[in-house]
Amino acid sequence: MKRTVIVGALLAVGAVGAMLRAQQPPPSPEASARQADLILSNGKIITVDERFTIAQAVAIRGDRIVAVGTNQEIARLAGASTRRVDLMGKAVIPGLIDNHMHLLRAGTTWVKELRFDGVESRKKAIELIQARAKALGPGEWVFNIGGWAHQQFADDPKPFTRDELDQIAPNNPVALQESYYQVFLNSRGLKAFGIEENVPDPTDFVKGSIMRDAAGKPTGIIKGDIAATRPVAARLPKVEANELEASSAALVADMNRAGLTSFGVAGCNADVLEIFQKWKAQGHLNVRTFCIGGAAASTPEQADRSIQQIAQMKLFQGDDYIDNVFFGESVYQPLHDPMFALKSNPRPDQLEQWRRMAMAIAKAGLPLHVHAELHDTIDAFLDQIEAVNKEHSIRNLRWTLAHVNQINAPQLERMKKLGMYAAVHPWAVINGGIMHEGFGDGAYDMPALATIQASGIMWGFGTDATAANQYLPFTTLAFAVTGKMPGGLKVIKQTISREDALIAHTRKNAFLVFHEDDLGAIQPGKLADLLVLDRDYLTIPADQIKDIKPTMTMVGGRIVYDSINAAQPKIVRIPSERR
């Protein structure tokens, strides 16, 4: 990646300075109209524009960037009321965009969960379990719903056992869901679910998913992909209605702390979306939410009804904070391939229903964002899409295959010819060890990031968090550059440059959520979503990328996370100024 540098030597990395009020003579009316509300200077501004320009300073007016350049150039935009941040050499990047996360669903459990995202030590995980049990008191559930796998524990990468969890939290039921692969329970957790020795398995669990030893005693493991883990998650406590807003606020705060500012959201939970709408009206919604939803079907009869609904479906009725942008992620539910299946076997009758619905989506002129994981599923869907395209062109609809962990070069070429895009969600970030157990050396190309990048297709990063995967974007970026899971296990060989990885998490994702004119780069006219980092993404050793922390997160010119005042994020209210 060629970088264009427009500044000289930069200052050494240090703490973000306090905002300093500019001391200049009163500006003329003409100058006041041009002056910035906020200037960040003395930094390394990694713009992620088309030339990957590096600048020193950025000026913001209202919710948008008005100028990027040298310290001297940007200083000319300061006025008497301009606020300043001295970056003291720190790196700044655009706010990170996740193109596919189940964000709103997570709000229904977030404050109840014990998250292991980014935890690289089993010792640390045990300490977290013990601390949560102590804080909650006896009898309360200690649980999480995915986002981790035991192979990320560098000190002791093995599964939890029933006896071990009994010792760690003897007075609490425990359920630790490992991605969508398996769940570890202690004795109290098993009893709470009615799973006991010499007692038939509960009927809502998938047959054979409850592991037992030779004597018939439950081992504490529920195993067998999403269908097997779903009954556990369904029985775990969700927040009460009067707690939902606080849980959603904690979720958004954690996303901002991680450096995430915008999302393609699969399945926009109506109750949480209503809260987001309220926050937007009040002027303090701190993430941008671009919904992926629609009338998916499970039977031919439902497909008939869905086709009628598709004809009436309208997208792009929102704004740059909340909007509906895609039909998806499922079209015909029986073709939803599980993430840990070794092979998919799409049936002709199922593909016929999928094609009928896809034809209706194309006829209605709607964008499509569809789950497609395994090689066979991707081929089958491309066959159907090519047939649809002969009757209704999809070239300008930004149809996107999502997940695509087994995609290959011929499939990418077929997608390019159709004008399609790829939303890449590398499950190997946490599931690499599990995938190698199932796919052997083939897992080293899951996903084939170098092949995807070399294909020239438009693509971007997402996670499919918070159950299937972890949500931390710098963990994803580190994985893309090093091929390593948290904990250091090398699980893929096809890596990409740190510049290409960052572009895929910013500028290209802005395109995938239909906001390329507003998001994804630090450029004049774009929304002021940006991060100040505690270290330089471009120069630190690759193995340290996962450890990068934002010291400040900004959304639309408002500071929504500030590590210096992390307990009470500094909200700077700046009136919106539209172009």
What is the predicted function of each stretch?
Residues 1-9:
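Bacterial N-terminal signal peptides that target proteins for export
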Residues 359-369, 373-399, 403-404, 409-413, ...:
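His/Asp/Glu-enriched, well-ordered alpha-helical/loop segment
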